[in-house]
Curated annotation (Swiss-Prot):
Cross-referenced InterPro entries: ACT-like_dom_sf, ACT_dom, UPF0735_ACT_dom-cont
Family: Belongs to the UPF0735 family.
Protein name (Swiss-Prot/TrEMBL): UPF0735 ACT domain-containing protein Cphy_3604
Domain ACT: 70-145
Length: 146
């Protein structure tokens, strides 16, 4: 689980390849380029570098109220598991902005949460780790941050 910890790192401490991956993702999101090949060519990195890091680095922005993070969970269809997830968020003093759970198929449901991270929110990485450690959670993936 140590390789799944989250860190906030200043831009100046990041290797150039990670910054280029973020820029390539921005180009794709803004539709300035249409393919991953075009994006990687534009920022001068290999496609393999892009694929290696694309799910592991995101820009982190602050807004006036706080920070927001959107993440997705794949979880077993167990009564009370959603409540336990929400309880972990509440224990961390974070605010649920949006919540969407799919109808379970084959005993597995997907849950997407938008969370506001407030000044009084406890350590974000600890909150995510505590959610991921719950019995019945298959995985947690951060989809975006603002």
């Amino acid at each position: 689980m140590d390789d799944e910890k989250y860190y906030i790192v200043k831009k100046k401490a990041l290797p150039e390849v990670l910054l280029k991956v973020v820029e390539a993702k921005r180009l794709l999101d803004s539709e300035r380029v249409m393919t991953i090949q075009e994006a990687t060519d534009a920022v001068d990195i290999s496609r393999s570098s892009f694929y290696k890091y694309k799910d592991d680095i995101f820009p982190f922005h602050e807004n006036n109220r706080g920070k927001t993070i959107t993440f997705m969970l794949q979880m077993d269809d167990i009564p009370g598991l959603l409540s336990m997830v929400l309880n972990q968020i509440a224990k961390s003093n974070a605010n649920v902005l949006t919540i969407h759970q799919t109808i379970p198929i084959g005993g597995i449901a997907s849950l997407t949460l938008g969370i506001e991270i407030l000044p009084q929110t406890l350590e974000l990485s600890q909150m995510l780790e505590s959610i991921e450690a719950l019995d019945g959670i298959h995985y947690l993936k951060i989809l975006g941050r603002e």
